[in-house]
Amino acid sequence: MGTVNVVRVASRHKLSWYEKFYFYSIGKGLWITLKHFIKAAILRKAVTIEFPEKKRKYSTRFRGMHTMKRDEQGRERCTSCFCCMWICPADAIYIEAAEVTPEIQHLHPEDKYAKKFEIDLLRCIFCGMCEEACPKGAIYLDGPGEMATDNREDLILTKERMMQLVGGPIIGERQ
């Protein structure tokens, strides 16, 4: 008797819907990559922005450096209520309160003020919760976006560095 060779013929695997979607997504990603390659290599269009000469436009919702606002009379809006310090998830805000004396009464609308107000940008995650928590609208994240430095002390913002001269947005409005 002779031996019989048995050959198994495998049926073709049918792709499920998620496998089809996966291949579609891969194809779409490759198409986007090809478009960018054609723009950069063949058409010689610039991909990057030359930073110091050209600055990009930021969205109106962009969260930049922290700024502190003054009211219309030029007084500090911050009344040292500690709301921003308590709500900060990164614990990046430090406030030291002091009583307002008669000599500086014209600078502060309430009976206490922030003697020391510091934000550690090395810890800050720019979540904007301090801006939302402030009942007086004293702190906003609408400053410049460039904050590179070679000195760690420059990344600790003091009240004097954050304070703007006069005005600022009305509570709840962005510039």
Swiss-Prot record:
Say which enzyme class the record assigns.
Answer: translocase
Its localization reads: Cell inner membrane
GO molecular function, a single term:
NADH:ubiquinone reductase (non-electrogenic) activity
Q: How is the cofactor bound?
A: Binds 2 [4Fe-4S] clusters per subunit.
Q: Name one GO cellular component term.
A: plasma membrane
Q: Where is the 4Fe-4S ferredoxin-type domain?
A: 69-98, 115-144
Q: Name one GO biological process term.
A: aerobic respiration
Could you tell me which InterPro entries the record lists for this protein?
4Fe4S_Fe-S-bd (IPR017896), 4Fe4S_Fe_S_CS (IPR017900), NADH_quinone_OxRdtase_chainI (IPR010226)
Pfam family of this protein, just one? Fer4
Q: Which cofactor does it need?
A: [4Fe-4S] cluster
User: Which key words are in the record?
Assistant: 4Fe-4S, Cell inner membrane, Cell membrane, Iron, Iron-sulfur, Membrane, Metal-binding, NAD, Quinone, Repeat, Translocase, Ubiquinone
- Residues recorded as binding [4Fe-4S] cluster 2, renumbered to this chain, are 88, 124, 127, 130
> According to Swiss-Prot or TrEMBL, what is its membrane topology?
Peripheral membrane protein
The job of this chain, per UniProt, is described as: NDH-1 shuttles electrons from NADH, via FMN and iron-sulfur (Fe-S) centers, to quinones in the respiratory chain. The immediate electron acceptor for the enzyme in this species is believed to be ubiquinone. Couples the redox reaction to proton translocation (for every two electrons transferred, four hydrogen ions are translocated across the cytoplasmic membrane), and thus conserves the redox energy in a proton gradient.
The record's NCBIfam families line, in alphabetical order, gives: NuoI (TIGR01971)
Task: Cite the record's note on assembly.
Answer: NDH-1 is composed of 14 different subunits. Subunits NuoA, H, J, K, L, M, N constitute the membrane sector of the complex.
| Cited HAMAP family | NDH1_NuoI (MF_01351)
- Its recorded name reads NADH-quinone oxidoreductase subunit I
Q: What is the lineage of its organism?
A: Bacteria, Pseudomonadati, Spirochaetota, Spirochaetia, Leptospirales
Underlying gene: nuoI
